[in-house]
């Protein structure tokens, strides 16, 4: 083909031919899912073009939320969000190919794996002081503590209700 500029670039189903120039990209950016498809208008037109139904509208809503969150919080965009975006684009391209859309499919090689470093194990070592205070909370078996507990139990009023009696029997270990 001839790239002399005589022919305008061909736009995809969700991309305008010439993107608008925006002064403030946060407040003036058009939503990517509102592009009309085949003469239909409304916010679900793009979802209907992807195959319609609840699945299309859910994916368009989630893409809207993800796109708006990256505009509002640009510092959050990092390696994890890029990996999520590439996984999301790969999953949406596979669903569009099932519905017969003319949108090009992405290959599986476009999904990049982000290597995570060795994570510290949560079950072994490193938490030496985590359970140290439990030994201090243990019931003491010295005679003074046992006598004090016994006198406090005797001074308590007799339980009135069925559940209170059942609880006391359970705690004491006696059968009803």
Swiss-Prot record:
Region (Disordered): 1-66, 79-162
Provenance organism: Neurospora crassa (strain ATCC 24698 / 74-OR23-1A / CBS 708.71 / DSM 1257 / FGSC 987)
Translocase keyword on record: no
Keywords: Conidiation, Differentiation, Sporulation
GO biological process, any: conidium formation
Protein name stated in the entry: Conidiation-specific protein 8
Bias (Low complexity) ranges: 79-99
Domain of life of the source: Eukaryota
